C-alpha cells in the first residue's frame, strides 16, 4: 500500500479544498496522511491524522521552513525522511518546499540542484518540462542534471526512448546565450541517442521533444503562459456558446464530447502537480491555487510516482550517464 502525506495547510484554498480533494481521491491501495492543525483536522474522518501547531503562509520567506519545525510542511517532509510515508504533497510556498526538501531529504548523489518537472499537455500526450521554476538561473552542468532527471521521468511515464530538446530562441546551434550554447554541446556529448537539438516555445505542445530542458526562469514563464492561453481558449469557447443562436447551440451540444476532451487536455488542473526531482524522496508541488480537482489529480500523480519508483530510476540514470562519458 502506498502511503501519501498531504499538507492540509498549504495553498490559497487550504484547508477546505485540500480536504475535499483528498475525499475525491480515496483509493483502497493508498493510505492518506493529512498533516494539519487541530481545527483543520476536525472534520477529516477516514484518514490518518498528523496534528501540528503551525503552518507556513503563502508569502513566507523560503528559509522560514528551516526555523519553523512544527509547521505542516516541515513535519510532512520529516515523515517522508523517516520512511513513515512514500510521498509528500504540498500546495504551499514553492521556495519553502524546495528549501525544506533539499535540507531535510538531501540531494540524490550526483545532483547539484533539484528541479521542478511538469508533464505539460502535447499532441503526443505529454512533454516533460524541466526546470519549471525551482532555479531562476542555472549553469550548463545543472541543465545536464535536469536532462537526466527529465529523461528518467519520461521513461517512467511510458516513453521507451524519450527525445530531449533544449529550449532556446531558435533551432540553430549558435542561438542563445553562452550558458545555452555550452549546454547544447554537453547534451550532444552525453545524450547522443536522445538529444535532438534546440526547440522553441511553440514546440512545447507539439510533441517535437518528449523532454524540454531549460532554466527555471524561462521554464516557469513558459508554463504560466500555457496555463493562461488554455484558460483564454476555454473561456472564449464558453462565452461564444452562450452568445450563439439556437442552431449553433444545437451544434455545440452535438460536439459536447469533443469540447469535454479539449477541456481535459487544456485544463492545468489535469496534471495536478510537479515533482521536485533530485532530492532523496518523492515530493509533489501542487499549484498554489489548487482546488479539489487539482488536488485529486496531484494525489494520483503522487501515487503513480511512488508506484513507478521515480527516485530510484533517477539514481540509476545518473549513474548510467556518469559511467558512459567524460568527467563532468
Swiss-Prot record:
- GO CC term, one of those recorded: cytoplasm
Enzyme Commission no: 2.3.1.274
Tell me what reaction this enzyme catalyses: a fatty acyl-[ACP] + phosphate = an acyl phosphate + holo-[ACP]
* Disulphide bonds in the chain: none
Classify the source by domain of life: Bacteria
Give the subcellular location: Cytoplasm
Name the principal localization, coarsely classed. cytoplasm
- A GO term, aspect molecular function: phosphate:acyl-[acyl carrier protein] acyltransferase activity
- Signal peptide interval: none
Keyword set, alphabetical order: Cytoplasm, Lipid biosynthesis, Lipid metabolism, Phospholipid biosynthesis, Phospholipid metabolism, Transferase
InterPro entries, alphabetized: FA_synthesis (IPR003664), Phospholipid_synth_PlsX-like (IPR012281)
GO biological process per UniProt: fatty acid biosynthetic process; phospholipid biosynthetic process
Output the Pfam families linked to this UniProt entry: FA_synthesis (PF02504)
Q: In which pathway does it act?
A: Lipid metabolism; phospholipid metabolism
* UniProt-listed HAMAP family: PlsX (MF_00019)
Q: What does this protein do?
A: Catalyzes the reversible formation of acyl-phosphate (acyl-PO(4)) from acyl-[acyl-carrier-protein] (acyl-ACP). This enzyme utilizes acyl-ACP as fatty acyl donor, but not acyl-CoA.
Which family is this protein grouped under? Belongs to the PlsX family.
Describe, as the record does, how this protein assembles with itself and its partners.
Homodimer. Probably interacts with PlsY.
Q: Which protein, by its recorded name, is this?
A: Phosphate acyltransferase
Q: Which organism is it from?
A: Pseudothermotoga lettingae (strain ATCC BAA-301 / DSM 14385 / NBRC 107922 / TMO)
